[in-house]
Amino acid sequence: MSLQVIQTSLAGVLILEPKVFGDARGFFFESFNARRFAELTGINTPFVQDNHSRSAKGVLRGLHYQIKQPQGKLIRVVVGEVFDVAVDIRRSSPTFGKWIGTKLSCENKLMMWIPPGFAHGFLTLSEAAEILYKTTDYYAPEYERCIIWNDPAFGIDWPLAGEPLLSPKDKAGNALSRAEVFP
């Protein structure tokens, strides 16, 4: 796994750019190798679950996290393009309430590592997008939490062309001021 690791303004959140080998036939890249991932990032956490989601244009999912059994997520897009966001919700962190966003797509092949202690969300920019993500803990619906996507406490600059398509759960997300967050 040949990978450029890009630090972000949020400690622990990484953008990963794989080396892609391409020619007239197509392309190849190693999307995950546990040993190389640990060597290059310093993260030696086992992944226990892979998830695959598909979303239509304008769908906004988030901002999600699990308050117990928190999940680190390694995210990549295999179809289309999304604007992917991580928000620091660790109250003791110097970057508490800060966010980072980047475009992930099947074209740029970038990946984002979001460690436990962060909320995650994304907006689908293309007609459809499919996301694959690995998690460091199992899905536990009883611990799932949601912070409202447009909370002014964050001021996330979503690249929206109108109102997003939201699930009932995401419409009912808490404000940061009322949300259960990490110490």
What are the functions of these language-model segments?
Residues 104-127:
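Conserved metal-binding segment of the jelly-roll/cupin
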Residues 1-107, 128, 135-183:
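Non-catalytic, conserved peripheral segments adjacent to functional cores
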